[in-house]
């Protein structure tokens, strides 16, 4: 039998002669040159075609690529892209003009009729500032405007309070140093326009010389009279007058609040040391020079007047200044007419306090003739209805010596109107405010640094989850105990208040009883006197003693003891009210301090408020966060194709390019195999025929089968066999074996002509990587230091796992709900079907198809 040899190649392997054996021959599995077993019964099981093997290899690679697309680090890298996009959106959002948001505040108790709250605690912080948390409140619903005759809601009050909020990081209390320069105010008689000019020698305008002062790094500029300032060592540094004088600390003020641990003393209504003269109908008549007390800038000549258009009128002037930045505060000018002014030391400048129903304006006036005064609203000193003492950490009030005075309103009638308002601890409410109300929060710098900080915070939370849980558990226990303690204290204060009221009622009953006893004593004494003297003539109504009436009859001896008791009771009543208010204020301050997040253990609890502070307006509604979370989840889970395409674009390699290179490689490899197979076939034929070409062509065109076990084939030279074996071993290198077993691995790069080269890969000059940029390979190379691609970390994986778990739970819940609805529908359908069949059966029974009842017939 003649054997025919076919020469083909396994991709990436050895091209060996494929032999067809006879039916009697057996397959020898250990034969290197017979990889396929052939017989007449299974002629179709010969070597597969090259295209089929290439297609199978491509399918395997695509299946592996599809599996690798679900790796977790891809999702982590997508989360990084999502975080960057979110940061860009937030960066853009922070640049938009918007309404300022200062977060949650806690408002404590207040007094009836005062219109003032005792404390406000801001939970938000100001960027780059020292802690500025305790505020006092004022009514923001009052409008600021100038009517025909008065300036409502004192602008100095508004400006100073507003500026405290706006520049809290620079300690904007008025006893700081200012950089001032002298200026002139020039105006023409025909207009109300005033020009501000920088000069060395100043002249008076409106009765005063003027300074232009800057504070807080030129953020605020004020135009102020020299009389309100004091120069320091002949430099350009000035401080407000009164900072080194004695300040008034009132003993019994209705309001006594705390600024941190520092007191803020408030006195309201007309100033306690200045009153209007009694019995004078003219409201412009003032008197009482007053004690030597300094509230800001108060000269020795002081007076008080009601806000009346007859006394003072607003003079509207337009201040023209060169270009400036920040706030430029201009004064308010008044023209006043005062009659019968009594000067204590004959000085032309006096301080006038003009009070109205809801405001107090402090004026600095200069006499230009007998009764006419030019007045300017003071920039410092008393603000609104309250005098503030705001000490600074480094520059405090110099030579602090406080005089004790009693408020004139602390009589029995006036004090009873100041009752404590019942409060239940601290009430949180959100505050958002425009610039004209004073509660201002400048936008926080937000950008990539904040995103990095958020990622670091997330890592810290993930690393210390157990410790944070334990700490928060302990904090919750402490909070519960302290809340119960505050409730007990609040109930105690309420009980003390009720006891105080009960004492008042008891005191009134005692007074009434005392009056009745006095009357009884007087009547008894008169009757005893009449009984001693006797009656000359007695009727049922009259008793005529015959003696003239003596004034001592019926007059009881006066005792100062009872009056002392009454005075002490009134004093104790006032002390009780003061103590109750102080206790209430301390309780509110304790609640504020307690509710202020100030420990690491409360960081997790406080994280939500920090997010609300970073994203103004959005933090006020938890619904928006929930909606945003659901949208992100739907985007990540419902759009896998879009995400896959996005990832292919961002990964950089592109699978299409790698496939093209692989196809080029396979084509070159196939053509090289064909050439090599032909050469090996010629070598084999040469060995078989002994170099005879005629014998080769005879065997080629012969129809007889060729058997590879022929004697001529077995008698081929030993050297040729060894060369074939050596060539096979060199062709199947370790790298090539790896490619056959792992089609996704890389092929060794082409080496040029020296030492260990494969002469059959001379045309291969390509460097192929699996899919050109797989994340797994990139991360491996990044760990080896050959490629700088960031691999994903544990926090992102943890966050992604949390998102998937929550989504899966929600999905299971929805699917369970769908199953329940489906079961209910099937049950209802079954019930309806049973009812239908019963009705149909009853109907058929009552209405049969043929009637078996025969009707009677009449013949």
UniProtKB/Swiss-Prot annotation:
Record's signal peptide: none
Segments of this protein annotated with the region Fusion peptide: 446-466
Source organism, top-level taxon: Viruses
Species of provenance: Equine infectious anemia virus (isolate CL22) (EIAV)
The keyword Coiled coil appears for this protein: yes
Cited CDD domains: HIV-1-like_HR1-HR2 (cd09909)
Biased composition (Basic and acidic residues): 48-66
Protein's name in the database: Envelope glycoprotein
Regions that span the bilayer: 615-635
GO annotation, cellular component aspect: host cell plasma membrane; membrane; viral envelope; virion membrane
Topological region Cytoplasmic: 636-859
